[in-house]
Regions:
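Exposed, flexible binding/inhibitory loops of compact, secreted disulfide-stabilized domains
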Residues: 2-16, 21-143
Length: 143
């Protein structure tokens, strides 16, 4: 009886030794950067300069994490929001905006309040809007 159990344990251990490295190797190939990156010109737009319909859309979604695009005849607006934050002092950094592999990539980071920075205990909704010439590619957000 003990031999049967020990034999099953050995089989399971050998299977794990084979399966684990295979799983680990395939996990590394997940998110690949495009080979042909091309920078895209953009402008960070203030709320006052947005189309009214886009302002309303942002206002209705600001309390949740938001990734959206809005296109007019001439421009594409790319909107990213990080939802509700309990204090002031947050900003959004644009790391890169580029095209590659038939997509527009938007690489952003949320920057929290600096250590020791005075903050107000008030709900804030960090949102950034990037305006660029009209684009047809799908958008990939890296947030």
């Amino acid at each position: 009886m003990c031999r049967k159990i020990w034999g099953k344990v050995v089989v399971v251990m050998l299977a794990l030794l084979i399966i684990m490295p295979v799983c680990a190797m395939t996990g590394c190939s997940g998110s690949k950067e495009p080979d042909n990156k091309t920078s895209v010109d953009y402008t960070v737009v203030e709320n006052a300069d947005l189309p009214d319909e886009l302002k309303k859309l942002i206002e209705s979604k600001k309390d949740k994490v938001m990734r959206l695009t809005y296109t007019t005849k001439d421009y594409t607006y790319v909107v990213a929001g990080y939802g509700t934050r309990e204090t002031s002092g947050y900003s959004i950094k644009v790391n890169n905006v580029y095209t590659g592999d038939n997509a527009l990539y938007i690489d952003l980071n949320l920057i929290g309040p600096a250590a020791g920075e005075a903050v107000n205990e008030v709900e804030k909704y960090p949102v950034i809007v990037l305006k660029m010439e009209r684009r047809e590619e799908s958008v990939v957000f890296k947030m």
